[in-house]
Amino acid sequence: PKIKAEATSFSFIIPGKVNIPSDNQPHRILIASSSKEAKLDYYAAPKLSRHAHLRAGLKNPFPFPIFSGQMSIFLDERFVNTTSVDKQILPDEDMSLSLGIDEGIKIEKKLLKKFTEYSGVFSKDTQINYEYAIDIVSSKDKEIGINIRDNFPVSKNEQIKVVLESPQKGDAKTSDDGIISWDLRLKPNEKRTLKIKFKVEYPKDLKITGLE
């Protein structure tokens, strides 16, 4: 279509005629279509869901911005999901689209160990130890890439000390706000187990919550 850029908007001039019923209802018409190669991968947050989500990473293929709002997503001409675009996507800008849940990948997070220790002679400190396992099972017949995200507690109180023992640096990325991120490649029908291990130390007379 021909595009007319305004100060804060765009106008599209649709070639040819379009029949729109006179029924006081909104109707959609095709403005433009384009094909673009997308990179498919998976992502999961085991603390929130046991499912992996498929997503497509690509660049905006149109010579005009994709505006914020609701977007319907089709894969191989089949409707798969509705998502919300929260910001304007400029031409050739990177974008990520969720294509829904893939039942061929199962993820489970479970608590393996939790025990309490005490240290000190006169003013004892409490130390709680946690160990979690995240099991990822792929039944796909091809190699896939998947991003796994979880978290561990972060202390903003100088009396509370949190030590992350696993994963080690180099095995995963960690952020200052307690996010752990793994970028994995899984072979066909592979099962992988990730470990999270941390300890929390604090004075015995201090009560804390929200560790799990």
Go through the PLM ranges and name each one.
Residues 1-133, 140-161, 166-167, 174, ...:
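Intrinsically disordered, low-complexity Ser/Thr/Pro/Gly-rich interaction regions
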